Amino acid sequence: ADIVDDAALRLSLLERGAKIAEEKLQQPQMAFVVLQSAIAENWKNADFMAELQRLAEATGSWGELVGQFEGMIAQATSPADVLALHNIVARWYFHHLNDNEASWNHFAFVLDQDPKNLDALAAMTEIYWRLGNWDELVNILSKRLELTTVTDDRVSLYMELGKVFEEKIGDVGQAIECYIQAFKLSEDRLDVMKELARIYEMAEQWSELIDILEREMAVLDDVEEKIAVRFRIGTIWENMLQNNEKAAASYAEV
């Protein structure tokens, strides 16, 4: 293959050789080594990278692959290539080598050069979840909220931030505020309403719970579900707020 000048043809021949090694010779490690020789020219090729990673997984060669890419980082001259390579290696450390520190270091480099890199920020979120570093997780989610403009993504981030405050930090007030912000962005999202209703009930904020249940009823299509919510509102008026008049009015609508 060394005498072949055309890069596309050279890659095609190497891929064919790798396929023969794996399927005919039953030597996936040889197939991996064959493709390794094409990395420098083809690491930006999505199909090539998918096959390379498949073989790395099949042969347990992630450490070797990461080492090769670490060497490429040291030799890269394009700032864009350096960032892209750091991103790739960081993900491999996290997902395949379970090395949180190495993954963090590579993503930290990316963010130092590109503080608004949403992909790197999202990856750092995963690292902090794994490490249980809740304060840093709050910071990184807040940073992502500052940079994210897509409404559905902002809703998801507020919901995730609320979960951190509620379940990991134990700050129910902050959690409620996050869920409220998510609701304001998506007033027709039933899943957001149910989460807000759940935490209002847990916090015994009965008036707020009734308000959100009323909003929930407005978007429900199923008649039986509407009846169940209306009955629930009645029981809250009766048992929690001791307002029999409001309870009777709610029951009357069932």
How would you label these PLM feature ranges?
Residues 1-254:
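Repeat-based scaffolding regions
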